[in-house]
Amino acid sequence: MILTVTMNPSIDISYPLDELKIDTVNRVVDVTKTAGGKGLNVTRVLSEFGDSVLATGLVGGKLGEFLVEHIDNQVKKDFFSIQGETRNCIAILHGDNQTEVLEKGPEVLEQEGQDFLEHFKKLLESVEVVAISGSLPAGLPVDYYASLVELANQAGKPVVLDCSGAALQAVLESPHKPTVIKPNNEELSQLLGREVSEDLDELKEVLQEPLFAGIEWIIVSLGANGTFAKHGDTFYKVDIPRIQVVNPVGSGDSTVAGISSGLLHKESDAELLIKANVLGMLNTQEKMTGHVNMANYQALYDQLIVKEV
């Protein structure tokens, strides 16, 4: 079973409009509300793929109750309740544009943060792989993910970590390393304080920087150009076919689902990388974020090429 962790989930509300009129009333007929957050996108894709998944994280108030109720019934759930209210994230779809209004979310009390660590520690007993995704809510220290990784390491569970900014920096500087990180070029540039290109020789050098020491897998998305990856001392390039993209949002989360599944099933390097890329690509072909059509899985799988470089 895979444990997904979403520390700052949301109710994602979609308002489709023909036109967004400013300083007047806009009436919405077709409102969509879903359980949102990067970790919950991972959860959905794992469930659709057919893997057993347990979802956890922080929820609060009536919106938190709504969120848990609207996670697929096939998914096991064991969230931790806090005093603050789970946030709303609103997307206004008008014409070809998308305007987002994102609430900050609850401020987590120090004791709640400590109590969740104990909650997380207990959940580790029943899972084989951990996937941690997204931002930290206000109130938690910047090195909180390092604490989660430490507990998972102590329990012997591999961790796939998908976060960015100060939270990722804190983990990289910690002695407690995740099994997998999944930065893109922009995030690599942020971490190193210099521009990083998609040149394979440069990426090889970058991924051997001391900052990344001790991390077993580093998987870098190159968008339409595929993926570059380092596993131990071996480097890989994944070539992908051109596809029709409908909605790219959530493709990174779907990739995390594939990585986590590959670790769960102890697949070869090539199998893990292909699965991760295929699930990410399938997500881009759907309107709904964090959703894959498994009927198209094998045909796409057969088109991907993994090369050692």
UniProtKB/Swiss-Prot annotation:
Coiled-coil features, chain-numbered ranges: none
Catalytic activity of the protein: D-tagatofuranose 6-phosphate + ATP = D-tagatofuranose 1,6-bisphosphate + ADP + H(+)
A Pfam family hit: PfkB
Gene3D superfamilies from the UniProt entry: 3.40.1190.20
Its EC number(s): 2.7.1.144
GO BP: D-tagatose 6-phosphate catabolic process; lactose catabolic process via tagatose-6-phosphate
Pathway named in the protein's UniProt entry: Carbohydrate metabolism; D-tagatose 6-phosphate degradation; D-glyceraldehyde 3-phosphate and glycerone phosphate from D-tagatose 6-phosphate: step 1/2
GO molecular function: ATP binding; phosphofructokinase activity; tagatose-6-phosphate kinase activity
Domain of life: Bacteria
Keywords: ATP-binding, Kinase, Lactose metabolism, Nucleotide-binding, Transferase
GO cellular component terms attached to this protein's record: cytosol
PANTHER family: 1-PHOSPHOFRUCTOKINASE (PTHR46566:SF5), 1-PHOSPHOFRUCTOKINASE-RELATED (PTHR46566)
Family, as annotated: Belongs to the carbohydrate kinase PfkB family. LacC subfamily.
This protein's name: Tagatose-6-phosphate kinase
Annotated source species: Streptococcus pneumoniae (strain ATCC 700669 / Spain 23F-1)
